[in-house]
Regions:
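Conserved catalytic region of serine esterases and O-acyltransferases that act on ester linkages
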Residues: 1-146
């Protein structure tokens, strides 16, 4: 059986999911979550936590597709953050940790780069200056790069 040639390239063929095990970003207020995962349904482990306004985390990445996997929680209010790719502060991406459903927390993926030129990128995520006291912290699960 011979398959026909692909119509389009598979942009995610070599995707990597980066957690505290695979990458060491620059932490400025964010902290690594080193709690041991207790099974495949124990999702919110091995990521990074931001709690206070101005906390930031910076990644040096290479790829043409980048996604941010974070927790949207039903434990509202939750901290919000913003992502800035390659210093483009005119076009930040909002990462809202508040989940509008009531069935449980959500592993949400926010694409920040899709089918662009493959090159080195800087991704900075910063906790916004919202009222953070008494809120659920921002939980960054992973960065997905292809």
């Amino acid at each position: 059986c011979v398959l026909p040639a692909p119509v389009t390239a598979n942009a995610y063929e070599y995707a990597k999911r980066l957690t505290i095990r695979e990458i060491c970003p620059k932490l400025s207020g964010f902290r690594a979550d080193t709690h041991e995962k207790m099974g495949h349904l124990d999702h919110f482990k091995n990521g990074w936590i931001g709690e206070n306004a101005g906390d930031s985390i910076t990644f040096e990445l290479e790829g043409n597709c980048i996604g941010i996997q974070y927790r949207k929680t039903i434990s509202r209010p939750a901290v919000r953050a913003q992502a800035v790719l390659d210093g483009d502060v005119e076009h930040p991406v909002l990462l809202d940790g508040n989940f509008d459903e009531d069935w449980g927390d959500c592993l949400y993926i926010e694409p920040v780069l899709h089918h662009d030129e493959k090159k080195k990128h800087t991704l900075e995520i910063t906790v916004l200056d919202d009222e953070c006291v008494g809120t659920t912290p921002f939980y960054l699960m992973s960065i997905i790069v292809a």
